[in-house]
């Protein structure tokens, strides 16, 4: 990673095994958080309290209460904090949303969103020694301690409630955010969901198949369909919002 960045900017960046060291560096203005989900809110709050602005990878937090704490921290320390739903920054998407808000198709009241994939089974992990390159104590951070298993790092932590938030907040958050933006809504008044782990019998805990319905005060509705292990497309696309 360091070598790749050096080639892009012709300057070798500093590296530290612990992000908290960067918070003490006066030359650092912004912390970009791309850690596992359970670290998102704590890292963002620490950064704000250290006087740093934050670009925070989705999801904002591991649970709703942490998200509220992040918002309060940004306000308290007067820091700029942006959550990484990057489509908000795409000019073509912003232009389309502006057209939608201007009434190009009338008043929209329903948005359908989805994400599909063909993820493989993660198997049943075995407790093993922590790899020499991994500071597992720091990786676990604020989470209660659990033994290291060989099917956890780098990506499969997404599917464990202890560290991750499942496909809904791994990918669903992108499409639902676009739908909220397009419908010009904020918090839902009613949420319902059903789903489960159906495709494989393994250590994966979060749903691999899920439906979420969100209703809003202005009589509008958003649905999200997630299928982590069945990549059959919807509307000829593996991911989308209409």
Which residues does each predicted region cover?
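N-terminal glycine-/serine-/threonine-rich beta1-alpha1-beta2 phosphate-ribose binding loop
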Residues: 1-56, 65-80
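Alpha-helix capping and helix-loop boundary segments enriched in small/acidic/polar residues
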Residues: 7-10, 34-38, 61-65, 84-87, ...
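Short loop/turn motifs at secondary-structure junctions
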Residues: 11, 27, 104-107, 187
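General small-molecule cofactor/ligand-binding pocket signal
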Residues: 14-16, 82, 192, 223
């Amino acid at each position: 990673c360091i070598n790749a960045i050096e080639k892009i900017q012709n300057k070798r960046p500093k590296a530290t095994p612990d992000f908290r060291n960067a918070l003490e560096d006066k030359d650092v203005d912004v912390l970009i958080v791309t850690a596992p989900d359970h670290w998102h809110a704590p890292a963002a709050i620490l950064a704000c309290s250290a006087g740093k602005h934050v670009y925070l990878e989705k999801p904002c937090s591991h649970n709703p209460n942490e998200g509220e704490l992040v918002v309060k921290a940004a306000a308290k320390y007067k820091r700029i904090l942006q959550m990484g739903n990057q489509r908000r920054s795409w000019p073509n998407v912003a232009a389309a949303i502006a057209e939608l808000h201007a009434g190009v198709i009338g008043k929209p009241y329903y948005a359908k969103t989805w994400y599909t994939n063909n993820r493989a089974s993660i198997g049943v992990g075995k407790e093993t020694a922590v790899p020499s390159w991994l500071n597992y104590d720091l990786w676990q951070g604020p989470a209660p301690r659990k033994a290291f298993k060989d099917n956890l790092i780098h990506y499969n932590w997404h599917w464990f409630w202890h560290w991750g938030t499942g496909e809904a907040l791994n990918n669903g958050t992108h499409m639902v955010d676009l739908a909220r933006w397009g419908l010009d809504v904020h918090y839902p008044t009613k949420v319902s969901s059903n789903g489960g782990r159906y495709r494989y019998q393994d250590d994966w805990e979060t749903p691999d198949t899920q439906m979420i319905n969100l209703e809003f005060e202005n009589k509008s509705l958003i649905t999200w369909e997630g299928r982590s292990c069945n990549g059959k497309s919807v509307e000829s696309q593996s991911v989308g919002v209409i």
